[in-house]
Amino acid sequence: MSETPTACLIGWPAAHSRSPIIHKYWLKELGIAGDYRIEAVEPAAFPDFIASLAARGYCGANVTIPHKEKALALSLPDARARAVGAANTLYFRDDKLHSTNTDVEGFIGNLDASAQRWRADDDAVVLGAGGSARAVVFGLIERGVPRIHLVNRSRERAQALAQPYGERVSVASWDDVESLLPKAGLVVNTTSLGMKGQPPLPLDVALLRADATVADLVYVPLRTELLTAAAGRGLQTADGLGMLLHQAVRGFELWFGRRPQVSPALRALVEADLTVK
């Protein structure tokens, strides 16, 4: 590894990532002489790249599409990475390559910061059953949420996600959503519905309780129709950009030894980049 601690983002493609903006901001803010780079690595070349990560001068890495599952297999994963089935953060300890999934911490950290009155002792409805949903469900289980209703078009995929958690996670269909919403203290959209270029999420926020919290993992656009409607009702909301920022905290801490803060100034910087792009 180089004397200057350096981390990278590995993906294919990877040029669209905002991670360099986030980590370079923290390096400068904390006065750390480090660096963060982008590495575009084809799937076929990924195993060799990981095997030579330290030799290339890196103290760790973020991993994005399509490498997250392979990163899990090529490292020593923690409980979060194993539960989610994917690793997005790699780091060295005692010359061994370890991995975690910081989406779990990112989701919960953003929820705590953006919707401070959300309650972990209340039921939750999670929409979608992909990789993001796995991180959300594991995070909610860690925090003690008693029951999670998992809604997905493919019941089989939802059942595979729910199975390890027993009765605490139940599978529901989209036809069940209207009956579930009035009982839920938290609703989380992990699907691409509402994203730029995608249809909006068909969810009636009028059915939610006045003390409910609505989280949307989409961050382009910053304010989805779902979050706009929820805020219009006076409900607490948490957006996808907040999760992106909070999930970066743990990786930075593992690589550079300092735990950074998600500040309004950092958020404004990334928001400006999203607007330009």
Curated annotation (Swiss-Prot):
Pathway: Metabolic intermediate biosynthesis; chorismate biosynthesis; chorismate from D-erythrose 4-phosphate and phosphoenolpyruvate: step 4/7
Key word Magnesium present: no
Family classification: Belongs to the shikimate dehydrogenase family.
Source organism of the structure: Afipia carboxidovorans (strain ATCC 49405 / DSM 1227 / KCTC 32145 / OM5) (Oligotropha carboxidovorans)
Disulfide bond residue pairs: none
Catalytic site positions: 68
Self-association and partners: Homodimer.
Identification of the protein by name: Shikimate dehydrogenase (NADP(+))
CDD domains per the UniProt record, alphabetical: NAD_bind_Shikimate_DH
